[in-house]
């Protein structure tokens, strides 16, 4: 029920405050020392007797815009609703961990910090975890990002990503009387097609996504502006740089091709006459996530493996783009794991969650927390 309540509090990008307040109340009820930092992260601490902090973090935000119906529906054992798995499952796991620490009255050597952070999704650019890592500084021993439900993976490698907003502007005009003037939407379409045709290597694994396109004012107006938001990802920073250059070149080629094909409205049947107007392109970075990798012989990974062995859980090593990217890029041991249960349809309106075997995930987090923090006898 707590997961449903959290999921039904809207938390779009840059709009996580109400959900943060709800999580803070849960932490306070569990007896944690609670604060909210300037970035909007809510932090609850179970204080240790010695220096060092073990940070468990789950992101508060979702990919869904303000106004999305976030009501959770039931279908048998399934809970269905935007964000119910990503990341209400992670937040509910933190809430359960807070209660377990309180009810067990356990004392640890290192401080166990639980944080609901902002800005993990979309254009948040991991601003929440950046602030947490900066705030704890050298005290930070380990970071465990709790992202989604599944416990059959351990994310030990952070995929690098760069995100851009490409904007093309032109003179605009009437679809009939100004026909032939360069069209920013057409120029953008040309560029997208050109970039989509480039070679994307299987190794290092890389990807791209044109996620949001905007432009135009009416069906009978030549638009004066068009923009697209693009996500580039790769396991390798040099390949990511190659993709960025290829994107710039393709979009500019689309602009130049559109200019060459345009003509003056007064040119009659002379379609070879170039338009004297010009177009401009702006290439704006809107996000950058660094890569990082946890060594296979890391004590953090060994601890999780030991707990998994005790619980009879088998988990594969994975790579992804999560809150763990930031500490990994700085050499701080970090992983991303699930909070328990099963889920699917992430980032869609039909996202679902099944609490089957959820207890296994919660036990896993609790035992990992105690093993890393150390019992204070």
Label every PLM stretch briefly.
Residues 78, 83, 87-159, 201, ...:
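Acidic/histidine-rich catalytic neighborhood of metal-dependent amide-processing enzymes
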Residues 2-5, 9-52:
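A non-catalytic alpha/beta surface segment that caps or lines the substrate-entry region
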Residues 45-87:
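Catalytic-core environment of secreted peptidases
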Residues 3, 8, 184-377:
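Metal-dependent amide/peptide-bond hydrolase catalytic core
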Residues 57-58, 115-117, 143-147, 167-169, ...:
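Short beta-strand segments
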């Amino acid at each position: 029920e707590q997961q449903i309540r959290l999921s039904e509090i809207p938390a779009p990008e840059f709009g996580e405050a109400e959900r943060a307040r709800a999580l803070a109340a849960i932490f306070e009820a569990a007896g944690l020392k609670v604060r909210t930092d300037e970035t909007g992260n809510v932090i609850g601490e179970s204080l240790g007797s010695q220096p060092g902090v073990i940070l468990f973090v789950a992101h508060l935000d979702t990919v869904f815009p303000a106004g999305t119906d976030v009501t959770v529906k039931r279908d048998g054992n399934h809970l269905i609703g935007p964000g119910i798995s990503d990341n209400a499952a992670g937040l509910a796991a933190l809430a359960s961990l807070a209660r377990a620490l309180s009810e067990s009255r356990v004392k640890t050597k290192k401080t166990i910090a639980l944080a609901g952070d902002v800005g993990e999704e979309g254009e948040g650019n991991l601003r929440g975890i950046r602030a947490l890592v900066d705030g704890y500084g050298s005290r930070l021993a380990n970071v465990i990002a709790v992202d989604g439900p599944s416990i059959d993976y351990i994310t030990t490698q952070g995929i690098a990503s760069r995100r851009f907003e490409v904007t093309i502007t032109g003179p605009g005009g009437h679809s009939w009387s100004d026909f032939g003037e360069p069209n920013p939407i057409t120029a953008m379409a040309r560029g997208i097609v050109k970039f989509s045709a480039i070679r994307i290597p299987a190794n290092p694994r890389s990807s791209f996504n044109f996620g949001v396109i905007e432009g135009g004012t009416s069906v009978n107006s030549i638009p004066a502006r068009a923009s697209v938001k693009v996500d580039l990802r790769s396991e390798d920073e040099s390949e990511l740089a190659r993709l960025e250059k290829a994107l710039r070149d393709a979009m500019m080629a689309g602009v130049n091709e559109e200019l060459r094909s345009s003509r003056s409205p007064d040119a009659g049947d002379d379609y070879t006459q170039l338009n004297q107007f010009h177009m401009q392109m702006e290439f704006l970075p809107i996000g950058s996530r660094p890569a990082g990798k946890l060594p296979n012989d890391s004590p953090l990974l060994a601890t999780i493996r030991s707990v998994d062995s005790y619980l009879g859980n088998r988990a594969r090593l994975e790579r992804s783009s999560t809150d763990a990217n930031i500490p990994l890029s700085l050499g701080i041991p970090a992983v991303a794991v699930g909070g328990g249960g099963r889920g699917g349809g992430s980032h869609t309106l039909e996202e679902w969650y099944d609490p089957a075997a959820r207890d296994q995930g919660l036990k896993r987090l609790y035992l990992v927390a105690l093993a890393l923090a150390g019992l204070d006898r």
